[in-house]
Each structure stands twice: as structure tokens, then as C-alpha cells.
Amino acid sequence: MALNAQDIARIANLARLELSSTESERMLGQLNDFFGIVEKMQAVDTSGVSPLSHPVAAIQDIALRLREDIASEPDQRDANQRSAPAVERGLFLVPKVIE
């Protein structure tokens, strides 16, 4: 996958960024380099490799100490929302940012 100048202009527009031509050219090179690395990684055959849950597990047996998934703090929604400019039915209201 290779991007072109129009792709960079579209991405910048979607992100509401104003890029100079120099910045646009630099971004094009950096993103294409990144996608080149991703393509190389995708080309590697990993069909015989077991998934890892921890990088150290590849070289030694480890026992993960996982805790139970329980709430450890009381509900503080009301306290957290006191300083919010707008709240409705327990949710923060924010301005619309996507047209």
C-alpha cells in the first residue's frame, strides 16, 4: 500500500490539519515507510507460531498473576460530574466534533 499526495491532503483535511508542502512531503515519506514495515510484517509466515500472552513466555515459563475483575473503588460518578459543564442522565455532554 502506498499513499500519494492526494491521500495526505485528505487525511490532513479529516484531521483538520493545515500542512505546508514540505510537511506534506515529509508526512508522505514517513507514512509510506511505516506502511512498508507493516507489509513486511504481514508477509511473515506465522502459521506454526503459538500466540504469546507475554513476551517473556517465549524464553521461559511464567505464571501470570491475574487478579479477579472486581470493582475496587466505589462509584464516584456524581463527584466526578460536579465540575462538568453539561451532564444528562449520568453522561457527559460534549460538543459535536464530527460533521
UniProtKB/Swiss-Prot annotation:
InterPro entries in alphabetical order: Asp/Glu-ADT_sf_sub_c, GatC
Role, per record: Allows the formation of correctly charged Asn-tRNA(Asn) or Gln-tRNA(Gln) through the transamidation of misacylated Asp-tRNA(Asn) or Glu-tRNA(Gln) in organisms which lack either or both of asparaginyl-tRNA or glutaminyl-tRNA synthetases. The reaction takes place in the presence of glutamine and ATP through an activated phospho-Asp-tRNA(Asn) or phospho-Glu-tRNA(Gln).
Subunit architecture: Heterotrimer of A, B and C subunits.
BP terms from Gene Ontology: glutaminyl-tRNAGln biosynthesis via transamidation; regulation of translational fidelity; translation
UniProt cross-references to HAMAP family, sorted A to Z: GatC
EC number, UniProt record: 6.3.5.-
Name this protein carries in UniProt: Aspartyl/glutamyl-tRNA(Asn/Gln) amidotransferase subunit C
First-level EC class: ligase
Catalytic activity: L-glutamyl-tRNA(Gln) + L-glutamine + ATP + H2O = L-glutaminyl-tRNA(Gln) + L-glutamate + ADP + phosphate + H(+); L-aspartyl-tRNA(Asn) + L-glutamine + ATP + H2O = L-asparaginyl-tRNA(Asn) + L-glutamate + ADP + phosphate + 2 H(+)
GO molecular function, one term: asparaginyl-tRNA synthase (glutamine-hydrolyzing) activity
Alphabetical UniProt keywords: ATP-binding, Ligase, Nucleotide-binding, Protein biosynthesis
Organism the protein comes from: Delftia acidovorans (strain DSM 14801 / SPH-1)
Recorded family membership: Belongs to the GatC family.
